[in-house]
A protein has these predicted regions:
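Bacterial N-terminal signal peptides
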Residues: 5-16
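A short, N-terminal "cap"/entry segment at the start of jelly-roll beta-barrel domains
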Residues: 18-63, 72, 143-144
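Ligand-binding loop in jelly-roll beta-barrel domains
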Residues: 61, 117-143
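Extracytoplasmic
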Residues: 61-66, 83-86, 118
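Conserved short histidine dyad/triad with adjacent acidic residue
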Residues: 65-83
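Short beta-strand segments in beta-sandwich/barrel cores
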Residues: 76-78, 94-99, 141
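Glycine- and acidic-residue-biased ligand/ion/polar-headgroup-sensing regions
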Residues: 84-96, 101
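Short acidic-glycine-tyrosine-enriched beta hairpin
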Residues: 103-117
Length: 144
C-alpha cells in the first residue's frame, strides 16, 4: 500500500477535528427544543427586549441564527441599517412597519417579513401595544 501524501492526512485530520468541534459546540448538530425560559433576556435603553435562541450551522452547511424580540409601543427603533445575511421576521403579536427600498409595508400577527441580503431597512412597532417577533437569520455573517 502506498503512503498517503502528508497534505491528504492533514486535510482528513482537520475535517475530523472540525466535525467533532461542530457537533460539540453547534446547537444545531442534533434535533432539540430551545426552552424559552432558558434564553437570556437583553434589555435595550429604549425598553426593547431580545432573547437569543441560537447561532449554529445546519448539516447542509448554512449558518443560521434566531432571536425573539419585543418592541414596546412608541419606542424609537434602530436606524436604517444594512445586513450581511438574509432574515425572515415572523410577527407573533402587534403590528410592525418594515421600511426598505423607499417604501413602508406593514405586517401583523402571522405575517412574515423577508429581508434580503444587503437590504437597507428598519423595523418599527406601529401598533398600540408591544410587538413581539422572531427573527431567523440565514447565511452571511450570521455566525457572529
Amino acid at each position: 500500500m502506498k503512503n498517503l501524501p502528508l497534505y491528504v492526512v492533514i486535510i482528513v485530520f482537520a475535517c475530523g477535528v472540525a466535525r467533532a468541534q461542530t457537533s460539540a459546540e453547534n446547537p444545531l448538530a442534533a434535533a432539540r427544543v430551545f426552552s424559552f425560559d432558558e434564553m437570556k433576556v437583553r434589555t435595550a435603553a429604549n425598553g426593547a427586549e431580545s432573547r437569543r435562541v441560537f447561532n449554529g450551522t445546519l448539516a447542509t452547511g448554512e449558518s443560521v441564527g434566531a432571536h425573539e424580540s419585543i418592541q414596546p409601543a412608541g419606542t424609537v427603533p434602530p436606524p436604517l441599517h444594512r445586513i450581511q445575511h438574509s432574515e425572515m421576521v415572523v410577527v407573533v403579536k402587534g403590528t410592525l412597519e418594515f421600511d426598505h427600498d423607499g417604501k413602508a409595508e406593514r405586517a401583523g400577527p402571522g405575517g412574515i417579513i423577508y429581508v434580503a441580503l444587503g437590504t437597507m431597512h428598519a423595523i418599527k412597532n406601529v401598533g398600540d401595544g408591544p410587538a413581539q417577533y422572531v427573527v431567523i437569520q440565514i447565511g452571511g455573517d450570521t455566525r457572529k
